[in-house]
Design a protein with these regions (language model features):
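Short stretches within intrinsically disordered, low-complexity N-terminal or propeptide regions
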Residues: 4, 19-26, 103
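Bacterial N-terminal signal peptides
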Residues: 10-21
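N-terminal secretory signal peptides that target proteins for export/translocation
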Residues: 1-8
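Cysteine-nucleophile amide-bond enzymes
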Residues: 26-210
C-alpha cells in the first residue's frame, strides 16, 4: 500500500508539472480547436467517464473566430437550453480549467465548423440519446467533424453510465427511471472525456487559474 501511495503522489506531481508547462507554452487558439473543461468537483458524468490523463472532463466546445483571422473568438457549445455561440472570455470564466485539444489529422476545418454552426439553436440533449433532434456537447463534435472525403473524424463509442466497478450508478438509474426509460448503457454515443483521449486529438495547452 505504501508503494501504491508513493506512485499516486508521483503521478500527481508529474501531472501538475505537465499542466504547468503546457499552460506556459499554450499556443494561440485556432479555428476548430477543442476546449475540454475540467470540473472542479466530481459529478454524475465524471463518475462514469474519464478524460485524458484521468482528468475529470465533463464538457467540450469548439473554437470559432467570427469575421476571419482578426475577428473575435467564440466557442460553439451545446449547453442548456440550446446550442449557442459563447464569447471565449465568458467560456473561460465559466470553465476555469480548460485543456486545449487539436485534431492531428488533415480534417476539413472549414466544413466541420460550418456544420457545427448549423446546429446553433438546436435544443440541448440532456437524455444523451442517438438519432434525436437534440444535441449534447461531445455529440456536436462527433457528428460534425469530417475529413476531406466527408467521412467522420470521430466514430461513436458505446455509452458508459457505469463506474469503475462496472455497476450503473444510482444517479443514472434514477435519472432515466424518472423519465420512464431504461439507462441507454452501451448505445452508440460519445462523451467529452473519452473524446479527449482519442489518438487523433493532441492536447497542446491548458488554461487554468494562477
Amino acid at each position: 500500500m505504501a508503494s501504491l501511495g508513493i506512485r499516486i503522489i508521483r503521478f500527481h506531481f508529474v501531472l501538475m508539472a505537465m499542466l504547468a508547462t503546457m499552460a506556459a507554452s499554450a499556443q494561440q487558439l485556432q479555428e476548430g480547436d477543442l476546449l475540454f473543461s475540467c470540473t472542479q468537483e466530481p459529478n454524475a458524468i465524471t463518475d462514469v467517464t474519464s478524460g485524458v490523463a484521468h482528468l475529470p472532463i465533463d464538457h467540450v466546445a469548439v473554437v470559432h473566430r467570427i469575421g476571419g483571422a482578426q475577428g473575435p473568438l467564440f466557442v460553439i457549445e451545446a449547453v442548456k437550453p440550446a446550442v449557442c455561440l459563447t464569447p471565449i472570455d465568458t467560456f473561460m470564466y465559466n470553465n476555469p480549467q480548460v485543456m486545449v485539444g487539436r485534431v492531428n489529422q488533415a480534417f476539413d476545418v472549414h466544413t466541420s465548423v460550418k456544420r457545427c454552426l448549423r446546429m446553433v439553436g438546436k435544443p440541448y440533449d440532456d437524455l444523451y440519446l442517438p438519432g434525436d433532434s437534440a444535441v449534447y456537447c461531445s455529440e456536436l463534435v462527433q457528428m460534425n467533424y469530417v475529413l476531406e472525403d466527408g467521412s467522420r473524424v470521430f466514430e461513436t463509442v458505446p455509452m458508459s453510465f457505469h463506474d469503475s466497478s462496472g455497476q450503473i450508478t444510482d444517479y443514472w438509474i434514477d435519472f432515466y427511471s424518472s423519465r420512464g426509460m431504461e439507462v441507454p448503457e452501451g448505445e452508440p454515443g460519445t462523451n467529452p472525456g473519452e473524446l479527449s483521449r482519442r489518438p487523433m486529438v493532441t492536447i497542446i495547452g491548458s488554461y487554468h487559474p494562477e
